[in-house]
Amino acid sequence: MGAALTILVDLIEGLAEVSTLTGLSAEAILSGEALAALDGEITALTLEGVMSSETALATMGISEEVYGFVSTVPVFVNRTAGAIWLMQTVQGASTISLGIQRYLHNEEVPTVNRNMALIPWRDPALLDIYFPGVNQFAHALNVVHDWGHGLLHSVGRYVWQMVVQETQHRLEGAVRELTVRQTHTFLDGLARLLENTRWVVSNAPQSAIDAINRGASSVSSGYSSLSDYYRQLGLNPPQRRALFNRIEGSMGNGGPTPAAHIQDESGEVIKFYQAPGGAHQRVTPDWMLPLILGLYGDITPTWATVIEEDGPQKKKRRL
């Protein structure tokens, strides 16, 4: 409302100032007659080709601001009058409808739900006043009732997953320990077997030559025994028994051993010595020690040097 009054005051002051400058009356400006007269003069001057619209306004002594005010005021007045008429119409219709409603309104006392039972209102915090903490306890029971099933399901699933994971870890650890234990047992048995085995150093080519020589000698001895058989065929049984007794007696008295009883060795047998002093400790020759320690997982300094020399060389880090 204050803004509308301010606009009206500014409009009145502008009308008075424009009327003084141009000599036009306020009624002519508000009705639009002044604008029509100015447009007619400007059109006449521009059609003759003498000057433009701005020059015509300057010739008549009217500035562009004054001409804009004269052309805007009639439009503003018409719109304001229409708005006021619409507001009066709406206000009149509202007054008429209000009077009709008051005339048709029934002011009797309603009888709907007159016999309905009424429940007295009680403050929800009344129980908490009489029994402090009962509302919190009821809320906790409600939470447990609503969330109990889901909570038990989640906890049970978590416990089951923990049991499965722990069982899997325990089984993996037991299997790993059993595998390591069996491997150590096997390697320990293999090491003890190598320690107690009879070792022989042999030369394979020389052994083959010796075997061929023994075969040739056995063939020649077969032919010689056949000739001896035919040569000794004339001996009678008593003579043969006497000869056998004489040969057996010579063997029992440390005599020469027949060639058939001589066992040829395929190589040089390595002699193992026990621990001195009867300590009953495990003894291993020096040449077998790296093998035994390797089976037990230990590496001697000599082997470490060999592995470091023969293994891949580490690349030098570039600076």
Swiss-Prot record:
The keyword Nucleus is assigned to this record: no
Family annotation (InterPro entries): Polyoma_coat_VP2 (IPR001070)
Short sequence motif named Nuclear localization signal, residue ranges: 311-319
Molecular function, one GO term: DNA binding
Cellular component annotations (GO), alphabetically ordered: host cell; host cell endoplasmic reticulum membrane; host cell nucleus; membrane; viral capsid
Lipidation (N-myristoyl glycine): 2
GO biological process, one term: symbiont entry into host cell
Record-annotated membrane-spanning stretches: 287-307
A Pfam family per the record: Polyoma_coat2
Region entry D1, spans: 266-301
Region listing for DNA-binding, in residue ranges: 306-319
Record flagged with keyword Nucleus: no
Keywords tagged on the record: Capsid protein, DNA-binding, Host endoplasmic reticulum, Host membrane, Host nucleus, Late protein, Lipoprotein, Membrane, Myristate, Transmembrane, Transmembrane helix, Viral penetration into host nucleus, Virion, Virus entry into host cell
Family of the protein in this entry: Belongs to the polyomaviruses capsid protein VP2 family.
Subunit structure: Isoform VP2 forms homooligomers, and heterooligomers with VP3 in the endoplasmic reticulum membrane. Interacts (via D1 domain) with VP1.
Protein name as annotated: Minor capsid protein VP2
Organism: Murine polyomavirus (strain A3)
Lineage: Viruses, Monodnaviria, Shotokuvirae, Cossaviricota, Papovaviricetes
